[in-house]
């Protein structure tokens, strides 16, 4: 799914844009993704799990997502740097077509700049235009207080908990929470 770019200001005054990634962005998107998953335990992968992903494969993935009517991926670009991404995946089956999944990732150096809020506002706006959509869903890992605060600010509420759903490298287990925002 393609949408028009959305320009906004960060809290520190810098200009940013949320836009669909182009195939030419693949290398920087891949670098950003690998960096983000290495900066936190609150995402579902480690950098070494993505080492085999090539720039060419990432470019194909970006193109496929952009062409899909049921997926939207946006990157946040700040002064030529891809600072994060967000996505929404609409279910197309009859029984689950009223649901969509949403996710975000932001480089640590860009935290507390309003990017997450801008991403969620954009994704919610897109979701509101989707006929028949009744709820947005996301998951977060226990301990992600910053993420949880953002999600709650955007109208999401916890509806379920999967005990010990995530096992970290140190062997510790964390619960995973499901949140829903009714449309």
Residue map of PLM features:
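Terminal substrate-recognition subdomain of acyl/acetyltransferases
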Residues: 1-14, 170-183
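A short beta-loop-alpha structural element at the N-terminal edge
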Residues: 16-31, 182
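Acetyl-CoA-dependent GNAT
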Residues: 49-98, 103-109, 126, 182
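Conserved acetyl-CoA-binding loop-helix of GNAT-fold acetyltransferases
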Residues: 104-106, 112-127, 149-153
């Amino acid at each position: 799914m393609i949408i028009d770019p959305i320009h906004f200001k960060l809290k520190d005054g810098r200009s940013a844009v949320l836009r669909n990634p182009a195939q030419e962005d693949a290398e920087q998107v891949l670098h950003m993704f690998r960096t983000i998953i290495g900066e936190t335990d609150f995402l579902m992968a480690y950098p070494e799990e993505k080492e085999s992903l090539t720039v060419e494969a990432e470019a194909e993935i970006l193109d496929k997502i952009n062409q899909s009517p049921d997926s939207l991926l946006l990157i946040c670009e700040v002064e030529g740097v891809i600072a994060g991404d967000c996505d929404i995946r609409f279910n197309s089956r009859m029984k689950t077509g009223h649901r969509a999944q949403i996710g975000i990732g932001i480089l640590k150096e860009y935290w507390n700049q309003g990017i997450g809020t801008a991403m969620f506002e954009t994704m919610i706006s897109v979701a509101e235009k989707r006929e028949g959509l009744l709820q947005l869903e996301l998951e977060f890992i226990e301990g992600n207080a910053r993420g949880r605060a953002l999600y709650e600010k955007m109208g999401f509420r916890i509806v379920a908990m999967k005990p010990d759903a995530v096992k970290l490298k140190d062997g510790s287990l964390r619960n995973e929470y499901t949140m829903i925002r009714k449309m």
